[in-house]
Amino acid sequence: MRVLVLGSGVIGVTSAYYLARAGHEVTVVDREAGPALDTSFANAGQISPGYASPWAAPGVPLKAIKWMFQQHAPLSIRPDGTLFQLQWMWQMLRNCNAASYAENKERMVRLAEYSRDCIRALRAETGIAYEGRQQGTLQVFRTQQQLDGAANDIAVLERAGVPYELLSRDDLVRSEPGLASTRHKLAGGLRLPNDETGDCQLFTTRLAAMAEKLGVRFRFNSRINSLIVQNDAVRGALVDGEAMTADLVVVAMGSYSTPFLKNLVGVPVYPLKGFSITVPMTDAERSPVSTVLDETYKVAITRFDDRIRVGGMAQIVGYDKRLDPGKRKTLEFVVSDLFPGGGDVSRATFWTGLRPMTPDGTPIVGPTPVRGLWINTGHGTLGWTMACGSGQLLSDLVSGRSPAIRADDLSVYRYLRGGQAPATKPALA
């Protein structure tokens, strides 16, 4: 089957790779000059299935009000002048209850755990290297209240069979020796030994090269004008004014999927603006071993070979990619507060990206009511964590194979009248 994948971030490239491996003829189109040069370029670096949680959670509305008056707030909101922003936030608020949170977190952990298994298998099969580390991740709590509040997430982990370790202040240093001088600031932590880390951009670039060897064609520096629709079915896309026909089109354009598809399918994916700095490492002993997530500031600190990636926070401000100096100060503060002397923040590079977020936090992977049109987007802050699983899942569904995990509640159908799509569905039906 001829498949056209729109978007060459980590979601688009993993989709293309697994589709090609299943025997499909795949072409990838992107406006950038190469793979992973937009949202996948400088994310926080962790592959953390156990920490897969919706931003829409009980208590978040009240927290958001308090954050409005904090200097280092993890979430901020500015009206972007669109009705869609208001509708999206209202849908998110409707998910800020215990029942919805538990349901959404279960779906996210399910896909994220599967994805971690997929990247392990991929690594074993191909030897792909991306400055990865398989040493677990650690969430640190600055207050006893935060530590006590982890009980709800631990209950979900136990139901999903995810191994975890609840650590005291002194136990933290055994997992992350670099916290020795700052552990007095912390109440404890939650360690997930099966989580991983790695450079998403490096992974995506190298996987794209492997995909090319499987026959995938990449067309970069190309403007995707529109989809080609004939007889109520998608038959390809208009690219730089040229018709590129296909049996099936996969839209993996991140937060840009929403405006691109607005005349065909309502996709409730909003750009959640995030930030990162990449810090040259100066002292390995004062740096993290893997990923440390600061629960207070919603910031992740990740060790690469000779760099420290510090990323997180969120702004609901629309398609605004201007760099915010205040967010840089927050990132610099958090890494310096927990790992003083580990890196030279004065030489850090600053980046921002628009993470595609659904109101319930769960991505949209699978078919749509429009024949020939499939979607793989909406992974929010967990695109790197969920990429391989989403790509494999999409490939299985397109190929008519039964997926390894439940998939019906991951499709766009959960937002449409009529409910969930079937677990498997012929690609061209």
From Swiss-Prot:
Keywords: FAD, Flavoprotein, Oxidoreductase. FAD binds at residues 3-17. InterPro entries: DadA, FAD-dep_OxRdtase, FAD/NAD-bd_sf. GO terms for cellular component: cytoplasm; plasma membrane. Pfam families: DAO. One of its GO terms (molecular function) is D-amino-acid dehydrogenase activity. HAMAP family: DadA. Oxidative deamination of D-amino acids. This is D-amino acid dehydrogenase 1. It comes from Ralstonia nicotianae (strain ATCC BAA-1114 / GMI1000) (Ralstonia solanacearum). The lineage of its organism: Bacteria, Pseudomonadati, Pseudomonadota, Betaproteobacteria, Burkholderiales.
